[in-house]
């Protein structure tokens, strides 16, 4: 695959429920601590190498940011790193929080 695909928050939730894709959150550490999709891996410059070492490049990856914009750059980066299928979640965490508040974890 040469580029990432877009995924609605509803589609992302279905992948999440079925555990058929990895969910990564690229927001800043404070935002992630305040609340994130349950089970989301916090993907930062500091955690990127570990993520790449541990990842199965054949498993789809869903990238979540604040509103669905900055996730696009991260999604394209993961495609360039060799991931087979990568999605950017439209609406990002704000849409996830609005639609699926029961699927949020806070570290505070």
UniProtKB/Swiss-Prot annotation:
Q: Name one GO biological process term.
A: glycerol metabolic process
Q: Which Pfam families match?
A: Rhodanese
What residues sit in the active site? 65 (cysteine persulfide intermediate)
Q: What class of enzyme is it?
A: transferase
Keyword Cytoplasm assigned: yes
- Main localization category: cytoplasm
Protein name according to UniProt? Thiosulfate sulfurtransferase GlpE
UniProt organism field: Proteus mirabilis (strain HI4320)
Q: What is the lineage of its organism?
A: Bacteria, Pseudomonadati, Pseudomonadota, Gammaproteobacteria, Enterobacterales
């Amino acid at each position: 695959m040469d580029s990432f695909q877009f995924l609605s928050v509803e589609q992302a939730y279905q992948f999440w429920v079925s555990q058929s894709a990895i969910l990564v959150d690229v927001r800043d550490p404070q935002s992630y601590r305040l609340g994130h999709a349950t089970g989301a891996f916090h993907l930062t410059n500091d955690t990127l190498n570990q993520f790449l070492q541990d990842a199965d490049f054949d498993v789809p990856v869903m990238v979540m940011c604040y509103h669905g914009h900055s996730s696009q750059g991260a999604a394209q980066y993961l495609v360039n790193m060799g991931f087979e299928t990568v999605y950017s979640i439209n609406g990002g965490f704000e849409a996830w929080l609005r639609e699926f508040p029961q699927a949020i974890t806070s570290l505070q």
